[in-house]
């Protein structure tokens, strides 16, 4: 079963105007969302891209690392926990004139080892999956995160200028239908 949601704002940087087949990311990154007892573990980012925003832990892929290995490593570095029962949950493609172009891999974990702890990179915060603070997050999150936390997988294309979402195209999949691009 596939559902599609689409919205557009502005006249520049429409998702449909980009040749995504030839598009190349400048960075490959990951996000991890740990879910336990109908709550999701998010972070308030303390530094780097998105500092001050709430998001899932994650970061840039290192040489020789798979996206899943990166997501687990970054979660451990940012929260001092090891995510368990990890599943791929989507891919996000971000195009911006004033920020790096990013191909993001999304993962969900339904268990973890350790105690979520503040680090120099992040402050851990638990939220009910029904009360996610979208107003404090990247603008694109409101178009896909809730569905991913409810078990769908996502492929999303987003265009930004000055950290403002201009356009997006999002498709949701049941897990058995989702095949990552890379």
Q: Which ranges hold each PLM region?
A:
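Unchanged
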Residues: 61-84, 93-148, 169-182
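Intrinsically disordered, low-complexity segments enriched in serine/proline and basic residues
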Residues: 4-5
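Conserved N-terminal beta-strand and adjoining loop/helix that marks the start
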Residues: 15-41, 60
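Short Pro/Gly-enriched beta-strand edge/turn motifs at strand-loop
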Residues: 10-18, 89
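A structural microfeature
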Residues: 42, 90-93
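Short, charged/polar surface micro-motifs in flexible loops or helix N-caps
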Residues: 35-39, 110-115, 151-152
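A positional/architectural concept
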Residues: 51-53
